[in-house]
Amino acid sequence: PGVFDSLTQLTYLHLGANQLTALPVGVFDKLTQLTHLVLHTNQLMSVPRDAFDNLKSLTHIWLSSNPWDCACSDILYLSGWLAQHAGKEQGQAVCSGTNTPVRAVTEASTSPSKCP
């Protein structure tokens, strides 16, 4: 955490194809000028609640080719965020094993007991 905090003017962050398995809470909080965030082709199963809430300038985000865990209720933040910001998603984040779009996941199909 804090690794990007001093980069407050950063507009483009490419973290694709880095075998990331998790994002630290608050890792993007200071990146208010970020317009492009690339997270595709990693090993992300969910993102922390509020992970993208401070990215007020974001216009494009890439989340495809990650094994999103749509059985665990932790996915609901990302699902809701993507539904609210549909025009920003480049490609499509889909659930591991089902190819359901992450933005289409509902609370009824998830459970806290299914989280790792």
State where each predicted segment sits.
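Canonical leucine-rich repeat
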Residues: 1-2, 7, 23-26, 31, ...
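Short amphipathic alpha-helices and their capping/turn residues within compact interaction modules
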Residues: 4, 28, 36, 52, ...
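Conserved hydrophobic beta-strand positions in leucine-rich repeat
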Residues: 10-15, 34-39, 61-63
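Intrinsic disorder
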Residues: 14, 38, 52, 68-72
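Short, amphipathic alpha-helical segments
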Residues: 38-43, 48
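Membrane-proximal C-terminal cap and juxtamembrane stalk of leucine-rich repeat ectodomains
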Residues: 60-116
